[in-house]
Design a protein with these regions (language model features):
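Acidic, metal/ion-coordinating pockets
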Residues: 1-190
Length: 190
């Protein structure tokens, strides 16, 4: 159970000693592509404390990105979950992850986010000839921009999971890109 009073105290101490506050909560529901009520509640609390950036972990899948107003007039960027950077899980959406790209500027106005994005990552795995585990022994994380149909088709996409195929991967990446675009629009970046 989250101790809100203790967390508020820790955030306040951090704000007093720094120009920009980032929180990395372990939250959410595993494999849920959306957010849950506890994440929404905690995000509202973090915004009320003046947090600048939230990068969530735990669900193993990419969840929405949001850019919200704080009660103090500032803004808070939330990556609810970036999913897995690299994964040997066999659930469909766990093989796509995200890498946050955030530009923070500090000047006479203070420190603030001036740009952000997310690059989709793809975990590709295959056998290299020598089986050393029950899993694949060559695991590569590709940026979406470098992953191709040829790479996917030459590997073990989905490891036999019929629900995870190249078409599903393209659909999921398009949904992730749309969420990033929407958050960037809210921030006035597009």
């Amino acid at each position: 159970m989250l101790d809100y009073d203790r967390l508020a105290t820790l955030i306040q101490r951090t704000k007093e000693a720094s120009d920009f506050v980032i929180v990395f909560p372990h939250w959410g529901t595993e494999y849920n592509l959306g957010t849950d009520a506890s994440q929404t509640e905690q995000a509202t609390f973090l915004a009320a404390q003046g947090v600048d950036l939230v990068i969530g972990t735990h669900p193993h899948v990419v969840e929405p990105i949001d850019y919200i107003d704080r009660p103090d007039g500032g803004k808070m960027l939330i990556y609810y979950s970036l999913g897995n950077f690299q994964s040997l899980q066999r659930k469909e959406a766990t093989l796509l992850g995200g890498m946050a790209k955030v530009t923070i500027k500090k000047d006479f106005k203070g420190a603030r986010i001036v740009d952000f994005d997310m690059e989709t990552l793809v975990t590709d795995y295959r056998l290299g000839g020598v089986r050393v585990t029950d899993y694949f022994d060559i695991i590569t994380t590709y940026p979406w921009s470098k992953y191709s149909r040829a790479i996917a088709e030459s590997g073990n996409i989905g490891n036999g999971n019929a629900n995870f195929n190249l078409d599903y991967m393209f659909q999921l990446q398009a949904e992730q890109a749309a969420q990033v675009h929407e958050a960037r629009q809210k921030a006035g970046l597009e």
